[in-house]
Amino acid sequence: MPSYNHTSNGVNMANFRALGGKNTGRGGTYRAPYEWTLESVEQMGLGATENRMSSTLRDASSQLQAVASATVANDISIVDRALTTKLSQTESLKNMLETCLAEVISEIAELLSTKKRLEERNGKVQAKIGVNSNRMQVRSSRPPREMTMDEVEKGLIKQQGMLGSFSDRVARAVAQVDREVAQLEAVRAKLEADLRDKTEALRVDEAVLSIPTDPTVEGTLSPTFRRGAADCPPKTPHTWVRNTEDNLRNAHHWLADSARLRKAIAHAVANSRATEHDVANRLNENMLAKVAATRNLREDLQAQLEKVREEQARAKGQRSALTSALDDKRGPLAQARERLAVRKARPCRENVNDEVEAALAKEVAHLAAVTQQLSVKVAAVDREIAALDATAAQLESNIADKDDALRVDERVVLLDGRINLAQRPPSSVASFAMSDMSAPRTQTLARIRELEASLTSARREREAMESSIRQLRDTMGGGGAF
């Protein structure tokens, strides 16, 4: 096919026309017939050539138009498919971002709820620490005799240390939760920014897809979507997807870390609560047992004091009897001594160891011996009365200390808000509420209290029998002396 503006022989038509113009227009001269004929032939050749050139141009234009239409249609189809694929991919990433963002928001709410529960738990622990401190302070006011490192004191010290340690762990857990929330908030900000960009990208791509094939549309929508002055360099598709995947992967990492933290906190709180309730239950049992033991010991001391006072009364009665008997013997002794002294005044001739002399001497000796024995008994009874008085004073002092200790121990028990000792401690301070699961343990404790009561009763009976035996022995010893 000849090129445009050239003949089939390769002659350039522009140059040919320029040369043809030079051969025409010779005004005022004759031309040869040959030139005249040649001019027409050349012009006819030129016309034919122009016709061929025009036909060639029309064919080339038709082919170009067809190729251009096909190319444009294909390009538009490719762009539409690319936009549709991009919209689908962006929508998928947007959905994943929305799901992950919802999980992050939910996890932040769970962490804040965990923090609130920890703070409430720490408040209860601080209240228990206050009650425990008050108990230790009140218990320090017991009399010196009652200051013993008993199970109650050990339990209070153990509970104070345990509660302080748990309070420290709660504070550290709250700080860790705050750090975790800060990390999740940063993740949330990244996800929200990425989600906003994805939403805007969807809006832009949907607008691009909706632009019609119209010459008048150019310049109408682009100004409303034009980026700001701080343009950013374009990313590769791989980098674009990887950035979002990195955000999602980072979010899932912190979500898993937060879930592990909440699980660990829940496990630690459950264990500490179980340990705390167990220690509080044992402390409550020890306090009640201490009150019961102090009360029983005070009752035993009071019973013994009554026995000592009864023995004091009997000893004083015995002393009165001995004193009366001694007084009764002093008259006959004085009489016998006086008789013997008067009889010694007989003349020497009459100084005979006769029956009267022997009887008087024997009477004086018997009365002196009896008086001596009675005096010894009176002195012994006086010493015993003094010992009984001292014992009674010690018992009274001990009972007074036991009364003070009992009042202090009862006050210590009631510091948790109970009205009386029979009431169970509040569950927020001491132990769990009564349940069917604690029934076997309650029955066991009741059985232990019954056995302790039986043991106390048996001890009292034994002490009463020992006291009766001592009294019988004392009575037998006194009768033998007379």
From Swiss-Prot:
Q: Keyword set for this entry?
A: Cell projection, Cilium, Coiled coil, Cytoplasm, Cytoskeleton, Flagellum, Methylation
Any idea where this protein resides? Cytoplasm, Cytoskeleton, Flagellum axoneme; Cytoplasm, Cytoskeleton, Flagellum basal body
Which cysteines bridge via disulfide bonds?
none
Repressor: present as a keyword of the record?
A: no
Q: How is it modified after translation?
A: Asymmetrically dimethylated at Arg-462 during flagellum resorption. Probably methylated by PRMT1.
Pfam families listed in its UniProt record: Tektin
Gene deleted: what happens?
Answer: defects in axonemal inner-arm dynein.
**Can you tell me which residues the record assigns to a coiled coil?**
100-129, 171-204, 282-324, 376-407, 441-478
GO cellular component terms, alphabetically, are: cytoplasm; cytoskeleton; motile cilium
The residue ranges crossing the membrane are none
The record's principal subcellular location, in a coarse class, is cytoplasm
* Keyword Coiled coil applies: yes
Report the PANTHER family cross-referenced here.
Answer: TEKTIN, TEKTIN-1
- What biological function has been recorded for the protein in this entry? Structural component of ciliary and flagellar microtubules. Plays a key role in the assembly or attachment of the inner dynein arm to microtubules in flagella and cilia. Forms filamentous polymers in the walls of ciliary and flagellar microtubules.
Instruction: Please identify the protein, giving its name as recorded.
Output: Tektin
